[in-house]
Amino acid sequence: MKKVLVNIFLVALMTSFLLIILYPQDTREEIQSEETILPDIETPKITIYIPSEEDYMKQIKQLTERYDLSLTSSKQAAYYDNLLGDIEIQLNEIAQKNATIYASLEFNKFKKEHDEIRGVYFNGYLFNNLNKRESIEEILMSTNVNTLVIDVKTDNGHILFDTDVEEVSYLNNERVKFSKNEIQDLREIKDLYLIARLVVFQDPLFAKFFPDEAVFDSRLNKPYSQNGQFFLDPSSEKVQNYIVNIAVEACRLGFDEIQYDYIRYPDSNNKFMRFDTKNDFENRVNNINSFLSKSRKMLHNEGCLLSADTFGYILTNKQDGGIGQNLESIVENVDFISPMVYPSHYTNGSFGYQNPNKHPYEVITAALTDALDRGIDKDKIRPFLQGFWHSNEDIRNNIKAASDLKMDWLIWNILSVYELDSFSKLSE
């Protein structure tokens, strides 16, 4: 439905745009002043259907060329011929901008009605676990939580819905836990914003089946492994296409947003790691962000937004931490970032605290403020907060730190174990 609305809107916009661009005021006056009376020419009737940007541009070119045939002035014909290339570029840009506008409409509507995105992670493997479902539903019905983050592609390389992506037939990695109808049924609990978590460049199954697409260990002569994790080469076109295809299908299940996790290089200085492109700052940042840019365009065309999970320290580190995550670059290519500002993950002494985990409010405030001090729009930052190894009071302090900075927030707990007292009750 979103796609249809986008197409209808683009046709209307295109028509208005052509009338203005093809016949600017000075040209209309010039035509009217011509001594030769232009013959009546019936404008060809063209049915314009826009299933893709490529077809869209073909139709525009066809329409423009037919208008050229109706012009008798050689001066005018040359003028329009020179403009043709510029028109195509401008219309393509307009099409993408309006796809972005439409992708943002539902989000903006939700934010207006609910003020904040307040979410918890729901482990996709547990989607059909009755006890877990009841626990999550209780959180949703009794507290101000209004958002769920649900796995569609996991750290193990499993895809949790029925997919038509080609590589799945080789990988045998479907572990179906939910359908489109079941995702839609979640909204019967309450008005929810739904985010699909998709693990990107960490995939043991893909790395083992397609070793040429993985980060390679030249010492062991096999795909590089780090603590049991296998990383894919971010520059691989095959890997990128695989991920984007999964993301598009996940969007069509009814999710509002796709969230990329492990959108990075391995966090290791292992000298035996080998990549298709030189492992330096420029290549890392370019490979990550060109992929994000491509993904966002595809997802906006489907009506979904794109976010990226990042390490918390990139809010403070002004380089890329050796993993391709540079703050200023990455925020330009996604709709939101979710830095994982878990106090327990900061080293002793961070932000002046010997034990950061004991100071959740202060540590999270300091980390997020570092990003704001670098000029990052607070509306682009939606942190993942710590929902593990913390008391209910600690979790509330995590939330308070984000809320005091007027930021949305998500809570991470790998087992999706949450207690009502960690959140604001609806009656409060």
Where are these regions (language model features)?
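Conserved, mostly hydrophobic/aromatic
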Residues: 148, 194, 243, 250, ...
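The substrate-binding groove and active-site-proximal loops of carbohydrate-active enzymes
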Residues: 118-127, 164-177, 227-241, 278-286, ...
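Substrate-binding cleft of secreted/luminal carbohydrate-active enzymes
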Residues: 334-348, 360-428
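Aromatic-lined carbohydrate-recognition surfaces of secreted/lumenal glycan-active proteins
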Residues: 121, 193-203, 259-260, 282-324, ...
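Aromatic-lined carbohydrate-binding/catalytic grooves of carbohydrate-active enzymes
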Residues: 143-177, 267-269, 273-274
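Active-site-adjacent "subsite" loops/lids of carbohydrate-active enzymes
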Residues: 112-127, 184, 201-249
